[in-house]
Amino acid sequence: DFYFLNYEQHDPYELLCRYFSELLDMVTWGQFDSLAHLTYPLRYMPKDVEITPFADAIDRVFRALIQKQIALEVNASGFRQEIGESLPGEALLRRYYQLGGRLITMGADAHVPADTGSFIPRTCSMLRRMGFTEYSVYRGRRPCPVPLGEEYEGKEERSLT
């Protein structure tokens, strides 16, 4: 797990190269519905690690997701962490959209009850600004689209009610 690694002993760029290669292998295998934590390693790596050298590898993952009709999870937990943005962030989500990606799910990584649904309203607004019109929930391994309406506008960031 990237959380436990000592980055003085491991080259972050080598780890990311292997990570994105394994993600592509997993998506090619395709026996799951939604890819979560695309940028998970960045939470724990040194802050000066750049993801831009992996643009081609990420594009390959995005294209495979689109071809396999596997959703990309947009996780709101980054808004309540030091990273300060969704995971993946806006630039990668825009690229996914540009490549034709429309199938998304949302999560909040609520490890405590108070975080349930936190920052989902902000995430919905961000996704609408990018052009996304819906997200999916899964029933019986089938995506069920839910409109990204304006129902969250003006809502508290930590509350869906």
Segments (PLM) and residue ranges:
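Extended substrate/RNA-proximal surfaces in nucleic-acid metabolism proteins
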Residues: 1-68, 151-161
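Charged catalytic cores and adjacent phosphate/nucleic-acid-binding surfaces used
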Residues: 48-161
